[in-house]
Amino acid sequence: MHLLRTQPGGFVPDDGIAHLAQTPAELVILCSGDSHLALLAEAARALPDDYPSLRLANPMQLQNHASVDLYVEEVLRHARVILLSLHGGIGYWRYGVEQLVALAERGALLIPVPGDDRPDPELSALGNLPAEQAERFWQYLRQGGLENAGQFYRCLASQCLGRDYAWREPQALPRVALFHPRHAEATLEHWRADWQAGRPVVALLFYRTHLQAANTAFIARFCERLAAQGLNPLPIALASLKESACLAQVEDWLERSDAALIVNTTGFAQSNPEAPELRPFRRDVPVLQAICSLDNRPLWLDNPQGLGPRDLAMHVALPELDGRIVTRPISFKGLAWRSERSESDVVCYLADDERMDFVAELARRWAELARKPNAEKRVALVLANYPTRDGRIGNGVGLDTPAAALNILRALRQQGYPVDGLPASGTELIRQLLGGVSNDLEHLDLRPCAQSLALDDYLACFARLPERNRQAVLARWGEPQQDPMFRDGRMMVAGLRYGLTFVGIQPARGYQLDPAAVYHDPDLVPPHGYLAFYFWLRHAYRADALLHVGKHGNLEWLPGKGVGLSAECWPDALLGPLPNIYPFIVNDPGEGAQAKRRTQAVIIDHLMPPLTRAESYGPLRDLERLADEFYDASLLDPRRAEQLRGEILVLLRDNRLDREIGLQLSDDPDSWLPQLDAYLCDLKESQIRDGLHVFGESPSGRLRLDTLLALLRVPRGDGKGANAGLLKSLADDLGLGFDPLACDMGEAWQGARPACLEERGGEPWRTLGDTRERLELLALHWIERCLGGESPPATWRASGEVLRGLCEQVAPTLDACGGAEIDGLLAALEGRFVPAGPSGAPSRGRLDVLPTGRNFFSVDVRNLPTPTAWRIGFQSANLLLERHLQEHGDHLRQLGLSVWGTATMRTGGDDIAQALALLGVRPVWQAGSQRVADFEILPVSLLDRPRVDVTLRVSGFFRDAFANLIRLFDAAVQAVAELDEAEELNPLAARVRLERQRLEAQGTAPAEARRQAGWRIFGAKPGAYGAGVQGAIEERLWETRADLAEVYLNWGGYAYGAADDGTPARERFAQRLERLQAVLHNQDNREHDLLDSNDYYQFQGGMLAAVETLRGAPVASYHGDHSQPDNPRIRTLKEELNRVVRARAVNPKWIAGMKRHGYKGAFELAATVDYLCAFDATSELIDDHQYALLADAYLLDAETREFVRQHNPQALRDMAERLVEAQRRGLWQEPGAYREALENLLLDVEEE
């Protein structure tokens, strides 16, 4: 060990001996709270020169035995009196407490007191001062303030050191009080005297402890910065917003001051997550969360994540439960001054002027939204555009973004905003936008531009960027005149104004300007054209607020800190302190949280698309009919049965369904027909989307009924009464004796056949799948009848309760969503409070997320993985291991798993729980709080199988939001790696030993070799996001699968763990992937699928491409279906892709739903083609006939082709190009006549 001088803030960066460099003194005061130390150091300034010698220290700086022993030897053994103020109890500093007790036994006076407001009898009993006197010293510290601190010293000298000092008893400070830097007992009148008439009042809430610690300089400074922005500050010190008396007084001051806004610096949450509809404050004003960071400023500047885990929980995640708008850190703990008298560094909260100015300006802009007439407000709607093609404008997952934008514009016009000349439809809106410049470089020079920024104005804005940002842009992109958006001395901006309201196309990220950057530059800085767009919005257009419409744009994913951004972070530098309002799908808390935390967004959550059953169509329906006829004929007409068997075989082979299903066809149909039955039933009952959501509209008619059934299908909450699943309740009421959500669909039905089910459907009733279908139809029938005022049969007790819940709660909340979405958006634009609400997938039992229109929050990361997630993860892990053993004849030992932050938030940590279960490790939760406190290693004898060596590839948002889970999993990995178990039972330990030996043989130091050998968590470069594969595919910057593997490795080759925060580790990442036997990704809901998003092919497809390229051989790939929490399923990735193509992608029902949405519907068809081709490029799992199915359904079907041509002709070209490209690359290996048909179609489209 080596001696190490401690850093301000008590942070000891390694296990060296902390040396406080203090000399002996009569009185030593140890406080685990920096606020107490700062107060006592400040009060010590006023002590007379002859006061006993004094030392102040933080025991948390002395974290190991050697550090404690050194301090005892140098300081404590010489002290006459030792006072210890310890927060959290003896367990937080046990060895140190033991040494203090030993000193007391040798004659020192020991006064241990709690470090907070709660008595600690165990700690207090260790002292040797009478309890009454010890209690008094605790009260001095507990009440705080300079007066009490001064009396504390006087009392200590008098009572414990034999000095002649008069002293007074501790005086209680108010639990809530106004603060004024010039008045000891501030009043509202004191502040009124300072305020400027007509300015909005901003209440500034801060902890009473700052007042108690005399650490108010940063609060006074923030008041000055607020005033500089034209605001009247009203600082309020309080103990806790959860204390009713404190809250009542705060409410009173808010009303009396007519506060326009609240800036809150207190941590945690005021609201109850179970009742988020209860507003934190009665006053209908926004609440901004300003962060008083527990870290020091240099640590924050150097940390690519920004805030540490404690700050993330206290000042970000938990305040989001209250609907607070997350802003920036305004102060940091730091060395304020050196107390020579106590030989201690005084650590206080220090103001950060630049970040304070950001928050103050943001506060002013929110206050202005409430004061400015709507007719004078300038609002800009921003539509995302990626890929950067004209057929893909208006990204918004599950959202008809053009129609949503039009609904928003209409609502604004109705409320008196300056909106004029609106188009008749969303499709027409896009057509008008494409009359001007866009991100499409091919036609850029041929189109007019409706607004632009003069080069001189651009350069003036550019000059205001931080130096590092300016240099990065110039080094990467050169001068702005070289940018494609530069024309005739101006920087062009894509979009149109409707009246004074702007609709713009968000600029491209930059990879289309330099496609090769996708291989080596995951944190690419945005180009000049990107900067010009946001410069124009802020400084030329002078927007009062931005609306980024739909999940999601690219602003919140630009390089920079994960949370607690600095001025050099790109989202901060470009958006600045502008109000950002973000309509966002309710089932994606993770990516919504990214926008909230990096672009101060207020989320207005919206519904997922209407949901429905896939049902049967085309050859699937024909097969179902033939199978039914075969079973009937096999009993009555064997010759007819044989003929039907032949027809079934022909139909199966013609449609390649035998390969999709994996049927082993033989002369005995009994060996494969049940499997066919099960497959057809599974497809028919699959949940798919029926169209898209339109912001501001709830589903109606059939869409409403189908969606309600989807919401009632699985249990909610406790699964009892009205929360039970409707299908299972019907099955129970009818005495069917099975669970329709967890059955073998192909198994013969031997149960009862109630008349009410006999009436449903005209098809034969043979299998459990047929019974499930009849229950679905019965449920839909009674949903409609109950909503029409009828009551179900009195004997239906279980389903009757569910249907009553439907009428009383579920249907009304669904119906309320459309109006609530518009109301929430208008409230935000009027500078009012948008209530918080939970987030999640409604069809997975999360009906508490309805109605939408709220500013959703995510989860308390300290509680993850939850016990429910552990149950699901453990069950899914076992299913995976069983499936692999069954198919490969040996246990799975090496697995790669992709883990996303948004899925972790939705599920409470299914994926991490599954990874821990595979390792053979179980979380340990604290009693009462349910926070994860530790883990325990399960013995191999209990597992009854080998442990699995799991390698994680985490998303960038997971890295930013779940540092605690990274540390938990890393700790579990290292613990398992140290077990003394046989290689065949613990492949992780064996591999770590082998890698360590290899690295040491190459000259790596033993400790470093062990660290690298234990790396099992990899992700993107700090500050960067994504897997990179999309860029390579979109820009067609690849030739072989190995090229895509290279991109995946380059983007993901950074190691994370307790001792690593993005350490470059590409070689180790490749070595890990080369060892894998299988690749897994889980999906937690059915409100989307694998061909709906680029993320699935980037993460799982990319990993599979890398693994198989490195190994030179195929490996297993699995898809975990966690959409029904009580019934997780494991399929191969190929099986899941097959299901998605049949159930959704080429399903006429889904295509018809898209046709209701014009431009965006055609966009969705093109996206499906893109994602299918990309999945094949990465995974090589798409068959030729599946390309043909999409070509037939989208391009060669005359009606669908004409729909696309009319509404989104660019999408028609994009689809034809992509399928022709698939043929050229050999993905679609034998296209036959499709080659000529598609090439001719492409020529026709290009001519048009």
From Swiss-Prot:
Enzyme class, UniProt record, top EC level: ligase
Gene Ontology molecular function, alphabetical: ATP binding; cobaltochelatase activity
Reaction(s) catalysed (UniProt annotation): hydrogenobyrinate a,c-diamide + Co(2+) + ATP + H2O = cob(II)yrinate a,c diamide + ADP + phosphate + 5 H(+)
CDD domains linked to this entry: CobN_like (cd10150)
Gene Ontology BP term (one): porphyrin-containing compound biosynthetic process
Subunit structure as annotated in this protein's UniProt entry: Heterotrimer of CobN, CobS and CobT.
Annotated protein name in UniProt: Aerobic cobaltochelatase subunit CobN
Phylogenetic lineage: Bacteria, Pseudomonadati, Pseudomonadota, Gammaproteobacteria, Pseudomonadales
Localization annotation: Cytoplasm
Domain of life of the organism encoding this protein: Bacteria
Annotated family: Belongs to the CobN family.
Keyword terms: ATP-binding, Cobalamin biosynthesis, Cytoplasm, Ligase, Nucleotide-binding, Porphyrin biosynthesis
GO annotations of cellular component type: cytoplasm
PANTHER family referenced in this protein's UniProt entry, alphabetically: AEROBIC COBALTOCHELATASE SUBUNIT COBN (PTHR44119:SF4), MAGNESIUM-CHELATASE SUBUNIT CHLH, CHLOROPLASTIC (PTHR44119)
EC number: 6.6.1.2
Species of origin: Pseudomonas aeruginosa (strain ATCC 15692 / DSM 22644 / CIP 104116 / JCM 14847 / LMG 12228 / 1C / PRS 101 / PAO1)
Pfam families according to UniProt: CobN-Mg_chel (PF02514)
Pathway: Cofactor biosynthesis; adenosylcobalamin biosynthesis; cob(II)yrinate a,c-diamide from precorrin-2 (aerobic route): step 10/10
InterPro entries, per the entry: Cobalto_CobN, CobN/Mg_chltase
Record carries keyword Nucleotide-binding: yes
Function of the molecule: Catalyzes cobalt insertion in the corrin ring.
Principal location class: cytoplasm
